[in-house]
A protein has these predicted regions:
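Glycosyltransferase donor-sugar binding loop
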Residues: 33-40, 198, 225-239
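Conserved acidic donor-binding segment of nucleotide-sugar-dependent glycosyltransferases
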Residues: 309-310, 314-321, 330-335
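Short hydrophobic beta-strand element within catalytic cores of glycosyltransferases
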Residues: 294-297, 307
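Donor nucleotide-sugar binding/catalytic pocket of nucleotide-sugar-dependent glycosyltransferases
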Residues: 54, 136-185
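A short, well-ordered alpha-helix in the C-terminal region of glycosyltransferases
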Residues: 323, 330, 337-352, 358-364
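Aromatic "clamp/platform" in nucleotide-sugar-dependent glycosyltransferases that forms part
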Residues: 258, 277
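A conserved mid-protein helix/loop that constitutes part of the nucleotide-sugar donor-binding site
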Residues: 14-19, 193, 202-216, 286, ...
Length: 369
């Protein structure tokens, strides 16, 4: 069978979904990837893995209706040309316009993967509520013929059911994207205490809270290293260098920019921190667990699934700088807890978040095996 996989961002398609695409191939299917960046940047990389890559016109953050219309027709043209047997879509724009385009071409074997509901589903402001209302309506129309919709956490699944977007029989829960336990192996904790946050630099990921919590930590423990890794972003809530620079100048954090291999930084940290407001299931948390790192994250949809509070890390309230700093300082003062937390995290990754198990479940639900 031909399987089309459509998303908003080529980087995510390759670095976050490659294992799933290879699982499709392993089961005897042809795989075609569609995303935003030019073919000359990605075709060769995908081809080496047995995947055909094509560029489509799609913007992750645009609010322009004309841009969205162009996205719809770009996806429709790609699907009409390919004539796939099944379509997997993820990211909001791809889910809505990919599902609609496929349905209009009488392709009904479409499988949306909800990797998080995005910033509009986070409480805050009339504008977000208005956008959410529009998006809910779009989802209802786009997903009405989908046999299955995948969710990475129970909160997102419940929200879609309560909003009457889909019924619970079609709402399938999977354990995030999973983590490759061979690629991310348990590593010894470092001698010197350090914290690490890996994230796109946007407010909704809790980056500002991390920066301010690090300021409090450094005031009390100036020898502790606080690291930040991740790309700048075009999201409306992006945190730019103008915000970041004072923290760098004052020695609060060390910023390393974007990387395609985070293992080096994971191995350097004692504790991984992600104070996000909402996630699908944060892959960096899973990678930290697999590496054997305690985690401090928020009691938020998607994040809370990754931490058993007090066992492999701690949960803190969303947007609570002081609570975050308190837990960071608590672990600095109680380093004897780290080893057992690290062991529990790796064990949880093996039992719950093994990417092989996650990918097999998706294949079964898509009737590929």
């Amino acid at each position: 069978m031909k399987i089309a996989v459509i998303c908003s961002h080529s980087h995510t398609l390759y670095w976050y979904r490659l294992e799933l695409l290879q699982e499709f191939i392993k089961n005897g299917h042809e795989v075609y990837g569609f995303a935003d960046e030019p073919e000359e940047l990605w075709s060769e990389l995908f081809a080496e893995k047995g995947i055909t890559y094509k560029q489509i016109s799609i913007s992750r953050n645009s609010m322009n209706p004309f841009t969205d219309i162009r996205t719809y027709f770009s996806i429709r043209y790609a699907l009409k040309e390919l004539k796939p047997d099944k379509v997997l879509v993820f990211h909001a724009k791809a889910v809505v316009y990919g599902s609609l385009a496929a349905n209009h071409l009488k392709i009904y074997d479409v499988y949306p993967l909800m990797t998080g509901l995005g910033s509009v589903f986070i409480d805050g402001g009339k504008k977000r509520e208005a956008v959410k209302s529009i998006l809910v309506t779009e989802y209802r129309v786009a997903l009405k013929n989908c046999p299955v919709v995948f969710f990475q956490n129970s909160d997102d699944r419940k929200e879609f059911i309560n909003d009457k977007i889909i019924n619970k029989q079609r709402a399938v829960l999977v354990n995030g994207s999973g983590v490759n336990l061979d690629f991310f192996q348990a590593r010894p904790l470092p001698h010197d205490f350090s914290f690490l946050c890996i994230s796109r630099l946007i407010r909704d990921k809790g980056v500002y809270e991390y920066l301010e919590a690090c300021r409090i930590v450094k005031q009390n423990y100036p020898q502790v290293k606080c690291m930040l890794v991740g790309p700048m972003d075009s999201n409306p809530t992006a945190i730019g260098m103008d915000v970041l620079q004072p923290y760098l100048d004052q020695g609060v954090i060390e910023y390393y920019g974007e990387t395609d291999d985070i293992r080096e930084y994971m191995e350097q940290c004692s504790v991984f921190v992600l104070p996000s407001y909402r996630e699908g299931t944060p892959k960096t948390n899973l990678e930290a667990m697999a590496t054997g790192r305690p985690i401090i994250t928020t009691d938020a949809p998607g994040c809370r699934e990754t931490v058993d509070d007090g066992l492999n890390g701690f949960l803190v309230p969303i947007r609570d700088i002081n609570a975050l700093a308190d837990k960071m300082i608590y672990l600095i003062r109680n380093p004897h807890l780290l080893q057992e937390m690290a062991r529990m995290g790796r064990e949880k990754a093996e039992k719950v978040f093994d990417s092989k198990k996650v990918n097999r479940k998706i294949c079964r639900e898509m009737r590929l095996i």
